[in-house]
């Protein structure tokens, strides 16, 4: 069998695809897996590390507000569709799986026209425009949140939860060994701050407010992912940081970092929250305020209601509010332990099994024809 995974641009779309692909490869080692992405997406550096071939499509995100930039990028859509048809006709995959992102739409759409079995996964409670269009055409729609059913017109909707790479679960179960490997002492706290694959200005501002306090606490370690665009400026601004404060552009080995943390400060994208839950890490969640339908705040509230996180709105991140929210958590290890336990209960742990089962069911008719 040959499988094509289309998804990327950001980690939120790419990592669920990688989780499914890894799981499939474990149970079907002889099957061929290809990824389709975009020239500027995070997949260019991440996918090769997992050993999967990557095909690039010339397509970019289209801004929701009408402008000359919107029209310019719309001209790329027909080209990307043509390239998607050419690619699929050449590779002849048995199934196409889309997890959102710029490359997902043209590849999945072309696959539906070519009558190739198709599955899409929608990460958020408020589906994106591309997946709303595709939902009526594909063979199966997998959803993280059941309430997304109200916003999608499709025959075969499945509430599967969000797939997470197995390393998160494995490393969470071996947390003490992971902390030793990172050099985190028994009496030390590890704070991890990140804002997605591109970073987040607000997260960086929040960490800046906390740095003087971190300097005064020798038992507090920090891994701070600034985002590639902000790294050089912040590196110049905060010179001579102690060794226990590690500033990096991006955490590309997140399964080896996040499960070791005592507290995370991050946005509230669905994929990030699934990884936090799999890692059993409490969090301070600062939802991206411009997400469609404010879906990140909705995601965050699910964690808050389970006692696994604290919510800070972007507009509320003044220095006083940040310190009043986060410092008491760092002073309450017992509370962090309880929040960590609650975080581990939020996530469905059978997502990969259910999604791969749906894929296998779609492929059965093809298997029968070949035998």
Swiss-Prot record:
Localisation: Cell membrane
BP terms from Gene Ontology: carbohydrate metabolic process; cell division; cell wall organization; lipid glycosylation; peptidoglycan biosynthetic process; regulation of cell shape
Keyword presence, Manganese: no
Pathway noted in the entry: Cell wall biogenesis; peptidoglycan biosynthesis
One GO CC term, this protein: plasma membrane
Role: Cell wall formation. Catalyzes the transfer of a GlcNAc subunit on undecaprenyl-pyrophosphoryl-MurNAc-pentapeptide (lipid intermediate I) to form undecaprenyl-pyrophosphoryl-MurNAc-(pentapeptide)GlcNAc (lipid intermediate II).
The protein's name in its UniProt record: UDP-N-acetylglucosamine--N-acetylmuramyl-(pentapeptide) pyrophosphoryl-undecaprenol N-acetylglucosamine transferase
Organism per entry: Carboxydothermus hydrogenoformans (strain ATCC BAA-161 / DSM 6008 / Z-2901)
């Amino acid at each position: 069998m040959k499988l094509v995974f289309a998804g990327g641009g950001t980690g939120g779309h790419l990592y669920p695809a990688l989780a499914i692909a890894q799981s499939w490869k474990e149970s079907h080692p002889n099957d061929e897996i290809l990824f389709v992405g975009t020239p500027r997406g995070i997949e260019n550096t991440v996918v090769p590390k997992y050993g999967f071939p990557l095909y690039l499509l010339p397509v970019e995100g289209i801004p929701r507000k009408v402008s000359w930039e919107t029209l310019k990028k719309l001209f790329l859509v027909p080209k990307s569709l043509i390239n998607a048809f050419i690619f699929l006709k050449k590779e002849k995959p048995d199934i196409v799986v889309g997890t959102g992102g710029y490359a997902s739409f043209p590849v999945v759409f072309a696959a539906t026209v070519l009558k190739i079995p198709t599955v899409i996964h929608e990460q958020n409670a408020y589906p994106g425009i591309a997946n709303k269009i595709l939902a009526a055409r594909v063979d199966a729609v997998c959803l993280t949140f059941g309430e997304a059913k109200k916003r999608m017109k499709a025959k075969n909707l499945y509430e599967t939860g969000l797939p997470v790479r197995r390393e998160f679960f494995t490393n969470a179960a071996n947390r003490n060994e992971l902390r030793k490997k990172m050099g985190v002492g028994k009496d030390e706290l590890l704070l991890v701050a990140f804002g997605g694959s591109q970073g987040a200005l607000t997260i960086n501002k929040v960490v800046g407010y906390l740095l003087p306090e971190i300097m005064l606490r020798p038992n507090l370690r920090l891994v701070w992912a600034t985002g590639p665009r902000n790294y050089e400026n912040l590196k110049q601004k905060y010179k001579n940081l102690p060794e226990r404060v590690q500033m990096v552009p991006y955490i590309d080995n997140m399964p080896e970092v996040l499960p070791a943390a005592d507290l995370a400060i991050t946005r509230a994208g669905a994929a990030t929250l699934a990884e936090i839950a799999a890692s059993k890490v409490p969090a301070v969640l600062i939802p991206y305020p411009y997400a469609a339908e404010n879906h990140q705040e909705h995601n965050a509230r699910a964690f808050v209601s389970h006692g696994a996180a604290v919510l800070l709105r972007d507009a509320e991140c003044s220095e006083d509010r940040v310190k009043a929210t986060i410092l008491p958590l760092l002073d309450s290890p017992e509370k962090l332990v309880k929040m960590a336990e609650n975080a581990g209960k939020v996530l469905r742990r059978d997502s990969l099994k259910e999604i791969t089962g749906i894929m296998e069911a779609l492929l059965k008719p093809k298997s029968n024809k070949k035998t």
